[in-house]
């Protein structure tokens, strides 16, 4: 909160590590959602990609968090197709495609690649899911100096794009 005039939303969970997500003590989850209540802000549950061995435990944890803290969790960010289908079908809240959902190429060894304008696109397999409006937002990394979002806007005029910056 330091240096910010206001907080609009709290992102709770993990983009990258399923073990971090699964091993987080209940106290930490309760404190995070209590902070949301105190500040009067909603929470986004950020869900990592689970391995097959952790999938059942991951789904169970998501159930407990969404149903147990549904008064503040109004959005879920997922990072793979399977979890997208699971969350869209099971929960009545907004679903976002996370940063790992559609990784863009980037490599710091190729400066020219970063300096180019890059068109952000969705794989053809997923365009119908996005077109139907089941995904409300997409998160991307600043992989290039300029990102062209026109194809996304044309495909999904309702979409909200979040760019993660350092």
Predicted regions and their residues:
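Active-site pocket-lining/capping segments in soluble small-molecule metabolic enzymes
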Residues: 1-166
């Amino acid at each position: 909160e330091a240096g910010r005039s206001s907080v609009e939303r709290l992102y709770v969970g993990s983009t990258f590590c399923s073990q971090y997500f699964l091993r987080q003590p209940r106290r930490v989850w309760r404190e995070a959602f209590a902070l949301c209540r105190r500040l009067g802000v909603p929470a986004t549950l950020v869900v990592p990609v689970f391995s097959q061995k952790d999938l059942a435990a991951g789904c169970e944890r998501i159930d407990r968090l969404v149903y147990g803290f549904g008064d503040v969790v109004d959005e879920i960010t997922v990072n793979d197709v399977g979890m997208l289908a699971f969350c869209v079908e099971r929960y009545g809240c907004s679903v976002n495609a996370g940063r790992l959902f559609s990784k863009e190429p980037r490599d710091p060894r190729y400066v020219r690649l970063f300096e180019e304008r890059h068109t952000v696109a969705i794989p053809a397999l997923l365009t119908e899911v996005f077109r139907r409006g089941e995904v409300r937002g997409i998160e991307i990394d600043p992989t290039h100096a300029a990102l062209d979002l026109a194809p996304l806007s044309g495909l999904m005029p309702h979409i909200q794009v979040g760019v993660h910056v350092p």
